[in-house]
């Protein structure tokens, strides 16, 4: 599959949209799409992923729950690329983000609990970084904010060459217009990087109920190409070649043990109900004790 076809497949996005909702005083899944998206990436050390990391992250969830924080987030773990966990939180505005930070600072008990959790979690991590992105409604297609029934997230990262932002906009609009007509089920969200990374960085996100939707996206691509026609595909291919410097596509699985979601989600779907991390097996005691036995 050539570069353009791979890019096109990623932009096709299948069915459900990429709108991770965690807003001030609004339950995830019921609010409109917030504008500001904060993403924290945690790269785990070898052998420190899985339930070991889940247990450490559950301390953050418990701290937020005890404090009854109105700001929710979704945690997810990678199924491709370098082992890592992502934590996505959204706010209505940068002012709302500021108020959330101030509220945490003023809550001594919550701040202390988060500090303790961070120290324990840090022992498992190779590195950590954060990025802030802004939702672009114009380039998004039929985005849906409700992720309560979703289980996976596709994340495609595009780096646009300097001076080619208009070309990028033309590409996405061309793709959007055609998918809107040819593939009625298609949905996606586009976010532009605002802080924490290189300029010209865009995220195209899609949430999925199951991976069968990835299989269906191949058919969607065929329908798209047919609707574009030979001349349209040639023009699109040329724009992609001159404007997109690089792209990366990865898949993540939602992790309920790492997520702090609204009570509504937990009540309506067992997937989001907290589950205790597995405890190590305890060796059985001998029938009789030999006090002289050596350790």
List PLM regions with ranges:
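Short, intrinsically disordered, low-complexity terminal segments
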Residues: 7, 19-20, 24
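Bacterial N-terminal signal peptides
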Residues: 10-18
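Bacterial N-terminal signal peptides that target proteins for export
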Residues: 1-11
